Amino acid sequence: MSQKPTSHPYKPNMTQDELKALVGQAALPYVEPGSIVGVGTGSTVNKFIDALATMKDRIAGAVSSSVASTERLQAIGIKVFDATEVDELAVYIDGADEIDHAGYMIKGGGAALTREKIVAAQSRKFVCIADESKLVQTLGSFPLPVEVIPMAARRIARQFAALGGTATLRSKGGAESGEPLVTDNGQHILDVTGLKITDPLGFESQVNQWPGVVTVGVFAFQKAHVCLLGASDGVRTLVF
């Protein structure tokens, strides 16, 4: 991993929301004029979409990883293509719930992990945008999202228990609602705590082979190539 200094506007004591806007703006130079850009999901990506409005007439459009991002892109006048209409994307811009010093990530806090992984796989470069709190030594402190087919959820939870993890079915509107969250793909999400993921590649490969797992929120095979990190001294650029 190499690191480059910031070259983006910065002021001291920025809020987390301001840092998200800063890294969203910092991602714009990675967008090639005339291209179709891959766009992820989440609060930091929303700031990138807002910044992308300034160059909407210089790109051909976007491929989005969620219904929410599609609606936000269309609201500012950016054409959204279906992933099946595009063979390859130059760049994919998305956030992370955790990222380590090798560019491996945990993603899926916004429940869009499967589509995020699909769009990332179509892209030549993955640019992660995040604040410095997301940079970790070892993945696993953030609850690991796993998209599952509902009929397999209990069995998969037991498999995680055998690894030392505790899986909880994500609820729509919070745990008190009792109603399972349904993803854009019509599936459910397990959030798994108590894991230390020291071998992200091996872990992703292992869990993705369990029957009923749609995808696990470890992004090791689709790792970040660059991370723009909103830090106490501005934007740090990490290159993996």
Curated annotation (Swiss-Prot):
Per its UniProt record, what InterPro entries does this chain match? NagB/RpiA_transferase-like, Ribose5P_isomerase_typA_subgr, Ribose5P_isomerase_type_A
Write out the pathway annotation from the protein's UniProt entry: Carbohydrate degradation; pentose phosphate pathway; D-ribose 5-phosphate from D-ribulose 5-phosphate (non-oxidative stage): step 1/1
Keywords (alphabetical) are:
Isomerase
Q: Name one GO biological process term.
A: D-ribose metabolic process
| Domain of life assignment | Bacteria
- Pfam families assigned: Rib_5-P_isom_A (PF06026)
- What would you give as a GO molecular function for this chain, any one? ribose-5-phosphate isomerase activity
Q: Where is the active site?
A: E116
Task: Please explain the role this protein plays, according to its UniProt record.
Answer: Catalyzes the reversible conversion of ribose-5-phosphate to ribulose 5-phosphate.
List the protein's name: Ribose-5-phosphate isomerase A
Organism, scientific name: Polaromonas sp. (strain JS666 / ATCC BAA-500)
